[in-house]
Amino acid sequence: MVVALTGLSLGLGFYHLSSRSLWLDEGYTWLTAAQNVKGITAIAASQGYHLLPYYLLIHVLIGWFGDSAFVMRAPSVIAGAAAVPLMYLLAARLAGRRVGLYATVLLAVSQPLVFWQQNARDYAFVVLLAVASTLAAVVGIQDGSLGPLIGWALIMAVGCYTHPEMLLLVIPQELVMFLWSGSRRVRVGIVGLTMVGALLNLPVLLNAVHSSVYQTTPLLPPGVGSATEIATFLASGAGTAVPVTATDHALLGITFALAVIGVAMLGADLVDRGCNRSNLGLGLGLAWLVLPPVISWLVSESGHPDFLDRYLILSLPAASLVIALVLGRVQPRSLGLFGLVYLLIFRFGVLAPSYSAPLDDFSTATADLLAAARPGDCVTIASNQARTLYDYYSARLARSAGGRLTQPVQVLPFAVNGSPQVVLAFNDLPLGDYRNAQQPQFVAQAATGCRRIWLFQSHVGSPTGSATSQLFYRSLLTLERNLQLYFRPAGQFNYHGVAVSLFDRDRRPG
């Protein structure tokens, strides 16, 4: 049965794997992994070393098999599927085979897991490492052995270099290990391993504090809205790529009710018997589910916003574990099984529509632009981030067309299409320098050589967002005003997360 569920996870992950366009962050995966090892390490160092192991893996695969979306996404599918049997081992060790199967099937059909399995980012690996580290911690607690705890420490070290939010899992894991372990030797070992782990992860901690990623992340401070989004996400609701529906709200309500029942069960057990083997599962699951979001909220309030659903995917397996533990205690057993089936119907109802929804449809936007382009056309990219995937798709389309496709010249600033090294140079260009290249005098120069200019924009901020988001938005408005000094708007085309505007010199004002 576990093999079948692992196969189900692989099938759900590989289904239509390449049909959804790469989105902004996946473009950065391609951009980074396409560099040499020295370049990858330098980029990772500037961002707290997070994703370094992941980028190196994708770098090897690109070298072997090319840079298609399938190649870059396949490792995430496999990582997410690998978490499924580990979830069974964890839940079965805590509460028996039936609960193990419940937790396994719930995780396998979790929409957020499947969605991020189909992304060329590290989030599925975070789920795998979260489950693996928790399993090692449980074995160490139950067996009173230091060997599994050493494994736990090593997994957490790799996890922190994969994504720094894995640090949020340390506190709930150590809290449970201290409270539920009856071995003084294990507790002393935990303290020692924590000190060693802190030294191993010191580069992550120091760079994360000073990294520009955390200083310029365009996230607002946490609030009720973002908390609801994260709660829906952890309940395996949609919302990342598709609008939240009544099904998502129902799924959140059911999951929340089961979690509350779990809290009541744990409280009663602790009053009657204290921390023991029988309630370890609920104690661990609830701490794993609740504490990382709470800690993330507090960190975000300190000025380093990271209160975002996908950053907390490390707690996603905990929801499946808690639900399985609660349903496993329901009597008669048929009632618990009915509850599982009822919940799975909602999860499949959320999962099915999410396959067709891209986060950013760079693929279609770029293809349509190139299909409509004429000789003498130019294109300007509204932000350096959007340039990455425009170059990725335009270069691939040009290769497949065998030179028969018109490639507009990139202007404001001028750039060469398709080279990851060139794109990286623009991606690192400060916003102020980028805006200077789009001032009226440079637009005037472009007007002498461009009959039409396509404005390609994505993630250009918001007038009501964070300070960084507002800065990007004002930059876009300035660019549009400058273009209209010499060109007349001739069309607007909107896609998921991407917009393309056409400006025509032959129909300029006056």
Specify the residue positions occupied by each region the protein language model found.
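Membrane-proximal helix-loop-helix interfaces that form the catalytic/acceptor-binding platform
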Residues: 2-509
